[in-house]
Amino acid sequence: KVAFRAKPSQFAFAIGNSVTVSNIVVTLSTTASSADFNSPNYISNTFANNVGADVTTVYSGPITFTTSGTVNTTAFEYVINLSTPFLYSKGAGNLLLDITTPDGSTTSGPGSVGYAPVDYASDSPSSPDGAAIAFNGATSASPIGSNSVASVITQFTTTPAPEPATLSMAGVGLVALVARRRRKTA
């Protein structure tokens, strides 16, 4: 799952407690783009330039974001439960999270959708291990937006993938168990 921290309640005029979006598309990929402002691979404001070859749609559909609106919250209350797994290897590049609200999507509820209701931090000065964003409030007809070292505070909940050696050992153990059982019954 992916979760975001809501802004504290002093920003309630921009947030509200709940907002529903009729359709979002969430993709994950690895990317050569960097969060380091001084890097020649700094995240591009041309969105397609950031997406890796292993791009995977991990969620698509309606979603409701709800917050308790408590003062100075540090809880990650805006949650997207992913429907498709993504295997990330740091050696393949940086992790790119891309959230798109397709043209024609609607919102309802007292809150707003976009950059305003989520808490963010600035990675200034930028660093290779930091975070960066590219964003666009316009339509899909505008594939170029803005980029920044300010980034949404995001929590990724992960499940480690079993190592190939672990799977092999489990297979060897299973074969040995079956062989032992056959000897006892013979």
Listing of model-derived features with the role each one plays in the protein:
Residues 1-9, 97:
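A short beta-strand element within beta-rich, extracytoplasmic domains
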Residues 13-19:
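Short consensus segments that form the blades of beta-propeller domains
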Residues 10-13, 35-36:
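Short active-site-adjacent helix-start/loop capping segments
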Residues 162-180:
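A short, hydrophobic C-terminal helix/tail in secreted or cell-surface proteins
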Residues 183-186:
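Short, charged juxtamembrane terminal tails flanking transmembrane helices
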Residues 24, 78, 152-154:
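Hydrophobic residues positioned within well-ordered beta-strands of beta-sheet architectures
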Residues 91-160:
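Proprotein-processing/basic-patch segments
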Residues 19, 27-122:
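Aromatic- and Gly/Pro-enriched, solvent-exposed loop/edge beta-strand patches characteristic
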